[in-house]
Amino acid sequence: MGIKNLTKFIKEKCQEAYVTENINELSFKKIAIDTPMYMYKYKSMNAAKMVENNGIYYNPDGWLWSFIYFIYSLRKHDIHPIFILEGGYPEEKNKTRMARKKDREDVKKKTLSLEESISSYATSLRLRPEDIPQDLKEEWNKIAKKNNLPFEDFDFETVKDHVKQRHRYDIRITNRDYEKLKILLKIMNTPFIQAPMEAEAFCAYLYKKKIIHGIASNDSDILAYGCNLIVDFEFDVKIDEETKISKITYINYDYLLNKLDLQSSEFLDFCIMCGTDYNDNIYRIGAVKSYELIKVQKCIENVGKFLDPNNKKGTILILNHLRIRHIFNHYGMKNIDDVTNMQFLEKKASWSSVPNFYLLTMLTIKFNINIDLEWIRHGFEKCNIKWDCESEYEENVEKTNVEETNNEVDEFPIF
């Protein structure tokens, strides 16, 4: 997701743009959370647990535990999150979305095929190398090449573990997931907003309007929108026996521009040339070459004059840069009048109410979430935050019947 190879480029060319500081710098400030990104992150972590435990005691809703702990950790440090949910996307993203969907389907089919080969091979005598299924040989060759191992030393257990790891990449966000998360956020009395467009675009809009202080995401699109990007939270990292400190790491947008010696418009053109979710990059021109061209030519139009016009694969037409510029410069403001609770967002950061422990207990039981709520409650009490015992959501949660559908979220409007 995001700008193709941008973070890799930054780490190699401008590592100093990554800033790590004490998390208390965000205390009493509003932070927009790019919720879809965190859903993918936490669902992937939950899938990893399934792999580690061989599927034993696996709970497909276990990813909600991560959101509970995340919210608790933010509140512990007096950080005020606003979870931004997805609302739509521009039509230029259709190609990317379809490609990602096909990739997930291909991964799933390949994984099932490999598992069938593993099952078949496991029941055979496995006496001769020629008995090894071809697809398992190919997987082993990939492993051997990556780890500098002899190709002839086929290791069945290593291949089995490698195939098992593939389940971590079969991650889908469904309507059911969104409904469960909304229930959790209500019970935790944590604000969330349904964006009228893509979540990261609305986050960028709030940042530029100075309604929020920062954006938590791993989506490098945030940089193309011209915003600082909080890429990591580290909670209670132990430094020594007596000292614990929590940190944040973010990419400083202004420092990045200064270090790369680019204006904001030039940086956006650089991002477009790298390739985005809305356009492909020019054939055989990656991030490094794109930077070199923009650094000298200053804009995509001038780059077009520099390239060979007879090379159909090497023209700027594939970039669709006028439309993509418009998306990054104006798309975040589209349908903004449809957003509810804007007055709430503009208020000074404060917790309007505290989590409802009774309903949270009900939720963890209903969705079979394994979490030590007493430990969480004790943490809130240490922060002088008391649990609410009554809530307007109680009746709704008790009667909740989330539709058990695994349909992916693909019904968002296209703008």
Swiss-Prot record:
Keywords for this entry? Endonuclease, Host nucleus, Hydrolase, Magnesium, Metal-binding, Nuclease
> Which terms in the GO cellular component ontology are assigned?
host cell nucleus
Please list where the region (N-domain) is annotated.
1-114
Q: What is its main location?
A: host cell
Q: Which cysteines are joined by disulfide bonds?
A: none
The enzyme's E.C. designation: 3.1.-.-
Name the positions where Mg(2+) 1 binds. Answer: D34, E86, E198, E200
Names of the cofactor(s): Mg(2+)
Carries keyword Metal-binding?
yes
* Compartmental location: Host nucleus
Cited InterPro entries: 5-3_exonuclease_C_sf (IPR036279), PIN-like_dom_sf (IPR029060), XPG-I_dom (IPR006086), XPG/Rad2 (IPR006084), XPG_DNA_repair_N (IPR006085)
Function comment:
Probable endonuclease.
- For this entry, the protein name equals Probable RAD2-like endonuclease 369L
